[in-house]
Amino acid sequence: MAGSTQSQQSTVTSVDCSSIDTGISLVNSYISKKINLSHCKAIVFSEEYAYEGVSEELFTLVNNLEIRPDCNIIISRCKAMDYLNNVKPTLESVSARYYELILTSSEYTAYSENIALKDFYNSLLNSSSSPYAILGGINNKSTQKESTTSSVYDSEGSYKADETPIISPNGIENMGLAVFSGDKLVGELDGSQTLSHMIITNNLKSAVISIPNPYSQGSTISMYITQSKKTKTNLKFINNYPYITCDINVTGDILSLEEGLDYSNEEVLKTIQEYTNAFLEQNISSYLYKTAKEYKTDIASFGKYAIKNYSTWNDWYNSNWSANYENSFFKVNVNSSIQSGQLFTKI
Protein backbone atom coordinates (compact mmCIF):
# COMPACT_ATOMS: atom_id res chain seq x y z
CA MET A 1 0.00 0.00 0.00
CA ALA A 2 1.46 3.32 -1.02
CA GLY A 3 0.98 6.53 0.89
CA SER A 4 -0.53 9.53 -0.77
CA THR A 5 1.81 12.37 -1.70
CA GLN A 6 -0.98 14.90 -1.41
CA SER A 7 -2.41 16.12 1.85
CA GLN A 8 -5.95 17.30 2.32
CA GLN A 9 -6.27 21.05 2.39
CA SER A 10 -5.87 22.53 5.85
CA THR A 11 -6.26 26.06 7.13
CA VAL A 12 -4.11 27.87 9.69
CA THR A 13 -5.89 30.76 11.40
CA SER A 14 -4.22 33.24 13.74
CA VAL A 15 -5.99 35.43 16.28
CA ASP A 16 -4.79 38.02 18.82
CA CYS A 17 -6.58 37.44 22.12
CA SER A 18 -6.23 37.62 25.90
CA SER A 19 -6.90 33.91 26.48
CA ILE A 20 -7.33 30.64 24.60
CA ASP A 21 -11.07 30.50 25.26
CA THR A 22 -11.74 34.03 24.01
CA GLY A 23 -9.58 33.32 20.98
CA ILE A 24 -11.65 30.25 20.12
CA SER A 25 -14.83 32.31 20.47
CA LEU A 26 -13.46 34.94 18.10
CA VAL A 27 -12.55 32.32 15.51
CA ASN A 28 -15.99 30.68 15.88
CA SER A 29 -17.56 34.00 14.92
CA TYR A 30 -15.42 34.06 11.78
CA ILE A 31 -15.67 30.54 10.35
CA SER A 32 -18.73 28.58 9.27
CA LYS A 33 -18.27 25.71 11.74
CA LYS A 34 -17.76 25.52 15.49
CA ILE A 35 -14.22 24.57 16.48
CA ASN A 36 -14.06 21.10 18.04
CA LEU A 37 -10.82 20.21 19.81
CA SER A 38 -11.67 16.56 20.54
CA HIS A 39 -9.38 15.42 17.71
CA CYS A 40 -6.52 17.78 18.54
CA LYS A 41 -3.25 15.86 18.18
CA ALA A 42 -0.66 18.46 19.14
CA ILE A 43 -0.34 21.75 21.01
CA VAL A 44 2.54 23.92 19.80
CA PHE A 45 4.23 26.71 21.76
CA SER A 46 7.08 28.76 20.35
CA GLU A 47 10.34 28.78 22.31
CA GLU A 48 10.09 32.53 22.74
CA TYR A 49 6.68 32.14 24.37
CA ALA A 50 7.70 29.13 26.49
CA TYR A 51 10.62 31.03 28.05
CA GLU A 52 8.03 33.36 29.63
CA GLY A 53 5.95 30.52 31.11
CA VAL A 54 3.03 28.39 29.89
CA SER A 55 1.17 27.53 33.11
CA GLU A 56 -1.87 29.72 32.44
CA GLU A 57 -2.39 28.25 28.98
CA LEU A 58 -1.67 24.73 30.20
CA PHE A 59 -4.26 24.87 32.98
CA THR A 60 -6.81 26.20 30.50
CA LEU A 61 -6.11 23.34 28.10
CA VAL A 62 -6.24 20.68 30.81
CA ASN A 63 -9.58 22.08 31.98
CA ASN A 64 -11.03 21.89 28.46
CA LEU A 65 -13.29 18.83 28.23
CA GLU A 66 -12.69 18.47 24.49
CA ILE A 67 -8.91 18.16 24.61
CA ARG A 68 -7.67 14.64 25.22
CA PRO A 69 -4.95 14.08 27.83
CA ASP A 70 -2.81 12.19 25.27
CA CYS A 71 -2.52 15.28 23.06
CA ASN A 72 1.18 16.03 22.49
CA ILE A 73 3.08 19.12 23.69
CA ILE A 74 5.59 20.54 21.18
CA ILE A 75 7.97 23.45 21.71
CA SER A 76 8.92 24.94 18.36
CA ARG A 77 12.28 26.61 17.77
CA CYS A 78 10.47 28.92 15.36
CA LYS A 79 7.14 30.73 15.58
CA ALA A 80 4.29 28.32 16.25
CA MET A 81 2.40 29.56 13.21
CA ASP A 82 5.44 28.98 10.97
CA TYR A 83 5.70 25.44 12.35
CA LEU A 84 2.05 24.72 11.50
CA ASN A 85 2.32 26.33 8.07
CA ASN A 86 5.23 24.04 7.19
CA VAL A 87 3.42 20.76 7.83
CA LYS A 88 3.69 18.87 4.54
CA PRO A 89 2.60 15.22 4.93
CA THR A 90 4.20 12.98 2.29
CA LEU A 91 2.94 9.54 3.33
CA GLU A 92 -0.35 10.50 4.96
CA SER A 93 -3.39 12.13 3.41
CA VAL A 94 -4.75 13.54 6.67
CA SER A 95 -2.73 16.09 8.62
CA ALA A 96 -4.08 14.96 12.00
CA ARG A 97 -2.99 11.39 11.28
CA TYR A 98 0.41 12.71 10.20
CA TYR A 99 0.93 14.42 13.58
CA GLU A 100 -0.03 11.19 15.34
CA LEU A 101 2.40 9.00 13.39
CA ILE A 102 5.40 11.33 13.15
CA LEU A 103 5.63 11.45 16.94
CA THR A 104 5.80 7.65 17.27
CA SER A 105 9.30 7.61 15.76
CA SER A 106 10.63 7.78 19.33
CA GLU A 107 9.84 4.07 19.61
CA TYR A 108 12.59 3.14 17.14
CA THR A 109 14.99 6.12 17.09
CA ALA A 110 14.93 7.53 20.67
CA TYR A 111 15.88 10.93 19.23
CA SER A 112 12.69 12.39 20.66
CA GLU A 113 10.01 11.28 23.09
CA ASN A 114 6.24 11.20 22.85
CA ILE A 115 5.23 13.72 25.55
CA ALA A 116 1.52 14.01 26.24
CA LEU A 117 -0.38 16.86 27.87
CA LYS A 118 -1.11 14.67 30.92
CA ASP A 119 2.61 13.90 31.37
CA PHE A 120 3.63 17.55 31.20
CA TYR A 121 0.84 18.59 33.57
CA ASN A 122 1.65 15.89 36.15
CA SER A 123 5.36 16.76 36.12
CA LEU A 124 4.56 20.44 36.53
CA LEU A 125 2.56 19.78 39.71
CA ASN A 126 4.88 17.08 41.06
CA SER A 127 7.43 18.21 43.66
CA SER A 128 9.80 15.37 42.71
CA SER A 129 10.16 16.06 38.98
CA SER A 130 10.22 18.74 36.29
CA PRO A 131 8.38 18.82 32.96
CA TYR A 132 9.78 18.53 29.45
CA ALA A 133 8.29 18.53 25.96
CA ILE A 134 8.97 17.58 22.35
CA LEU A 135 11.40 19.89 20.54
CA GLY A 136 10.23 20.83 17.05
CA GLY A 137 11.50 22.92 14.18
CA ILE A 138 11.39 23.54 10.43
CA ASN A 139 13.49 21.59 7.94
CA ASN A 140 14.53 23.81 5.04
CA LYS A 141 17.62 24.77 3.07
CA SER A 142 18.55 27.60 5.38
CA THR A 143 18.64 25.34 8.44
CA GLN A 144 20.17 22.19 6.97
CA LYS A 145 23.75 21.69 8.08
CA GLU A 146 26.33 19.45 6.48
CA SER A 147 28.20 18.67 9.66
CA THR A 148 28.10 19.00 13.43
CA THR A 149 30.64 20.32 15.89
CA SER A 150 29.74 17.64 18.42
CA SER A 151 32.68 15.71 19.85
CA VAL A 152 30.77 12.45 20.30
CA TYR A 153 30.95 9.74 17.67
CA ASP A 154 27.19 9.40 17.42
CA SER A 155 27.01 12.49 15.21
CA GLU A 156 23.61 11.55 13.79
CA GLY A 157 22.13 12.02 17.26
CA SER A 158 23.90 15.27 18.10
CA TYR A 159 21.39 17.39 16.17
CA LYS A 160 18.36 19.25 17.42
CA ALA A 161 15.17 20.00 15.54
CA ASP A 162 15.82 22.24 12.49
CA GLU A 163 19.52 21.24 12.39
CA THR A 164 19.45 17.79 10.76
CA PRO A 165 21.13 17.48 7.32
CA ILE A 166 18.01 15.99 5.75
CA ILE A 167 16.67 17.07 2.38
CA SER A 168 12.98 16.23 2.33
CA PRO A 169 9.63 17.69 1.28
CA ASN A 170 8.53 17.33 4.91
CA GLY A 171 8.51 20.83 6.33
CA ILE A 172 8.80 20.03 10.04
CA GLU A 173 10.96 17.80 12.17
CA ASN A 174 10.97 16.80 15.82
CA MET A 175 14.30 15.97 17.43
CA GLY A 176 15.40 16.44 21.01
CA LEU A 177 13.59 17.66 24.11
CA ALA A 178 12.63 21.05 25.50
CA VAL A 179 13.60 21.25 29.19
CA PHE A 180 11.52 23.18 31.72
CA SER A 181 11.98 24.44 35.24
CA GLY A 182 8.49 24.90 36.56
CA ASP A 183 6.44 26.27 33.69
CA LYS A 184 9.35 28.10 32.03
CA LEU A 185 11.60 26.75 29.30
CA VAL A 186 15.26 26.71 30.35
CA GLY A 187 17.06 24.73 27.65
CA GLU A 188 17.19 22.00 25.03
CA LEU A 189 18.53 18.47 24.64
CA ASP A 190 19.75 17.08 21.32
CA GLY A 191 18.95 13.61 19.98
CA SER A 192 21.86 11.86 21.69
CA GLN A 193 21.02 13.42 25.05
CA THR A 194 17.40 12.42 24.56
CA LEU A 195 18.51 8.81 24.06
CA SER A 196 20.37 9.01 27.39
CA HIS A 197 17.27 10.44 29.04
CA MET A 198 15.09 7.60 27.76
CA ILE A 199 17.56 5.00 29.04
CA ILE A 200 17.59 6.58 32.51
CA THR A 201 13.77 6.81 32.63
CA ASN A 202 13.24 3.29 31.20
CA ASN A 203 11.40 4.58 28.14
CA LEU A 204 13.85 3.25 25.55
CA LYS A 205 12.34 0.66 23.23
CA SER A 206 15.07 0.49 20.61
CA ALA A 207 17.68 2.69 18.94
CA VAL A 208 20.65 2.59 16.59
CA ILE A 209 23.88 4.10 17.91
CA SER A 210 27.38 4.51 16.49
CA ILE A 211 30.35 3.80 18.76
CA PRO A 212 34.04 4.37 17.98
CA ASN A 213 35.57 1.38 16.20
CA PRO A 214 38.37 0.00 18.42
CA TYR A 215 39.99 -1.66 15.40
CA SER A 216 39.89 1.23 12.94
CA GLN A 217 40.65 4.78 14.05
CA GLY A 218 38.23 7.37 12.72
CA SER A 219 35.47 4.89 11.87
CA THR A 220 32.44 3.72 13.80
CA ILE A 221 30.43 0.58 14.46
CA SER A 222 26.66 0.80 14.16
CA MET A 223 24.66 -1.07 16.75
CA TYR A 224 20.99 -1.76 17.45
CA ILE A 225 20.36 -1.54 21.20
CA THR A 226 17.52 -2.30 23.61
CA GLN A 227 17.32 -2.34 27.39
CA SER A 228 17.58 -5.87 28.80
CA LYS A 229 16.61 -4.70 32.30
CA LYS A 230 15.15 -1.57 33.77
CA THR A 231 17.67 0.98 34.96
CA LYS A 232 18.31 0.56 38.68
CA THR A 233 18.66 3.91 40.42
CA ASN A 234 19.93 4.50 43.94
CA LEU A 235 20.06 7.89 45.66
CA LYS A 236 21.68 8.80 48.94
CA PHE A 237 22.72 12.07 50.55
CA ILE A 238 26.34 12.85 51.38
CA ASN A 239 26.66 16.10 53.36
CA ASN A 240 23.18 16.92 52.03
CA TYR A 241 24.41 16.53 48.44
CA PRO A 242 22.51 13.96 46.35
CA TYR A 243 24.72 11.10 45.14
CA ILE A 244 22.90 9.19 42.41
CA THR A 245 23.97 5.81 41.03
CA CYS A 246 22.45 4.40 37.83
CA ASP A 247 23.03 0.76 36.85
CA ILE A 248 22.10 0.19 33.20
CA ASN A 249 21.81 -3.04 31.22
CA VAL A 250 21.54 -3.08 27.43
CA THR A 251 21.75 -5.67 24.69
CA GLY A 252 23.25 -4.81 21.32
CA ASP A 253 23.28 -6.32 17.85
CA ILE A 254 26.18 -5.23 15.66
CA LEU A 255 24.86 -3.94 12.34
CA SER A 256 28.20 -3.09 10.72
CA LEU A 257 30.19 -5.77 8.91
CA GLU A 258 33.88 -5.05 8.50
CA GLU A 259 36.27 -7.04 6.36
CA GLY A 260 38.76 -9.11 8.34
CA LEU A 261 36.95 -8.70 11.66
CA ASP A 262 35.69 -11.93 13.24
CA TYR A 263 32.57 -11.14 15.25
CA SER A 264 32.45 -14.74 16.48
CA ASN A 265 35.71 -14.19 18.36
CA GLU A 266 35.06 -13.70 22.08
CA GLU A 267 37.93 -11.25 22.48
CA VAL A 268 36.61 -9.09 19.64
CA LEU A 269 33.12 -9.01 21.14
CA LYS A 270 34.55 -8.29 24.59
CA THR A 271 36.51 -5.31 23.26
CA ILE A 272 33.46 -3.92 21.43
CA GLN A 273 31.40 -4.47 24.57
CA GLU A 274 33.89 -2.46 26.65
CA TYR A 275 33.80 0.37 24.12
CA THR A 276 30.00 0.31 24.15
CA ASN A 277 29.94 0.53 27.95
CA ALA A 278 32.39 3.45 27.98
CA PHE A 279 30.55 5.28 25.20
CA LEU A 280 27.16 5.04 26.90
CA GLU A 281 28.56 5.87 30.34
CA GLN A 282 30.18 9.04 28.97
CA ASN A 283 27.09 10.19 27.09
CA ILE A 284 24.66 9.45 29.92
CA SER A 285 26.89 11.15 32.51
CA SER A 286 27.15 14.19 30.25
CA TYR A 287 23.35 14.34 29.96
CA LEU A 288 22.87 14.04 33.73
CA TYR A 289 25.36 16.77 34.60
CA LYS A 290 23.84 19.02 31.94
CA THR A 291 20.42 18.78 33.57
CA ALA A 292 21.84 19.29 37.07
CA LYS A 293 24.60 21.88 36.65
CA GLU A 294 23.44 23.84 33.60
CA TYR A 295 19.65 23.58 33.57
CA LYS A 296 19.22 22.87 37.32
CA THR A 297 16.06 20.87 36.76
CA ASP A 298 15.18 17.24 37.46
CA ILE A 299 13.44 15.96 34.33
CA ALA A 300 14.46 12.35 35.12
CA SER A 301 12.32 12.35 38.29
CA PHE A 302 15.15 11.44 40.66
CA GLY A 303 13.14 13.19 43.36
CA LYS A 304 10.99 10.08 43.76
CA TYR A 305 14.09 8.28 45.05
CA ALA A 306 15.02 11.18 47.34
CA ILE A 307 11.63 11.51 49.01
CA LYS A 308 12.03 8.24 50.92
CA ASN A 309 14.78 9.90 52.98
CA TYR A 310 12.24 12.21 54.65
CA SER A 311 9.84 11.10 57.36
CA THR A 312 7.16 13.78 56.85
CA TRP A 313 5.77 15.76 53.95
CA ASN A 314 6.87 19.03 55.58
CA ASP A 315 10.45 17.76 55.81
CA TRP A 316 10.37 16.88 52.12
CA TYR A 317 8.80 20.20 51.14
CA ASN A 318 11.29 22.21 53.20
CA SER A 319 14.23 20.35 51.67
CA ASN A 320 13.53 22.22 48.41
CA TRP A 321 14.53 19.35 46.11
CA SER A 322 14.21 21.46 42.99
CA ALA A 323 16.98 23.74 44.29
CA ASN A 324 19.15 20.96 45.75
CA TYR A 325 19.17 18.88 42.55
CA GLU A 326 21.87 21.11 41.05
CA ASN A 327 24.22 19.84 43.78
CA SER A 328 23.89 16.26 42.57
CA PHE A 329 26.76 13.97 41.65
CA PHE A 330 26.35 10.88 39.49
CA LYS A 331 27.86 7.46 38.96
CA VAL A 332 26.79 5.62 35.80
CA ASN A 333 27.50 1.92 35.30
CA VAL A 334 26.64 0.28 31.97
CA ASN A 335 26.68 -3.46 31.39
CA SER A 336 26.15 -4.46 27.76
CA SER A 337 25.69 -7.82 26.08
CA ILE A 338 26.84 -7.59 22.46
CA GLN A 339 26.45 -10.03 19.59
CA SER A 340 26.71 -9.87 15.83
CA GLY A 341 23.44 -8.94 14.20
CA GLN A 342 24.57 -10.39 10.86
CA LEU A 343 24.16 -13.86 9.42
CA PHE A 344 27.90 -13.70 8.74
CA THR A 345 30.38 -13.37 11.58
CA LYS A 346 33.55 -13.38 9.52
CA ILE A 347 34.56 -12.45 5.96
Regions found by a protein language model. Give the residues of each.
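Membrane-proximal alpha-helical signals and transmembrane carboxylates
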Residues: 1-347
